[in-house]
Amino acid sequence: MEVCVDNVDSLINAVQGGASRIELCSALSEGGLTPSFGFLKLAKSLTTIPIHVLIRSRTGDFNYDENDLKIMAEDSKVLVEAGADGIVFGCLDKQANIDVNGCKLILDAVKNNPINLTFHRAFDVVQDPIKTANVIKELGFTRILTSGQVSR
């Protein structure tokens, strides 16, 4: 069972409760944002279960501009180098289709690392989930996090 946490108390409770994987975030009340480097380092010192970090530079939709993508790529690189076992993100265009180029920019930042790649709940707002799932697989993601498109 994966548990999303955005503070140390939640992390400890998740570990003690039997979580098998942690999704580390900040600002879950805002839909989740990228956690700090310090939070990841502390989390890694408190548990040995896999920790995947959310990569999301801001609240709102999943259509990111060039600057957002640069920030997310750099955050991905730094957090993987700091020990993240995986990254969780998703990029869409203005029509709610997968932003392949945006995803590739972030994936390229971590391509030399053996990590897990999860496409997050941006999947829940795409127009064509079957086509999108195939594109996600082709890009190299290993997981899709979804509510079954409840957000649509």
Residue ranges and their predicted role:
Residues M1-N7, I55-A73, L117-D128:
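Active-site mouth loops of central-metabolism enzymes
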Residues M1-G31:
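N-terminal entry module detector
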Residues A14, L79, I106, H120, ...:
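Conserved, mostly hydrophobic/aromatic
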Residues P114-R152:
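Histidine/lysine/aspartate-rich catalytic loop segments that bind and position anionic ligands
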Residues M1-V5, I22-L24, A43, I51-I55, ...:
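Hydrophobic faces of well-ordered beta-strands that scaffold small-molecule active sites
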Residues V8-I12, L28-H52, N67-K70, L92-K111, ...:
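Active-site-adjacent beta->alpha loops and helix N-cap segments on the catalytic face
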Residues E74-C91:
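Ordered, amphipathic secondary-structure segments that act as subunit-interaction surfaces
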Residues Q16-I22, T47-P50, G83-G86, K111-P114, ...:
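Glycine-enriched alpha-helix->loop->beta-strand junction motifs that scaffold or abut catalytic
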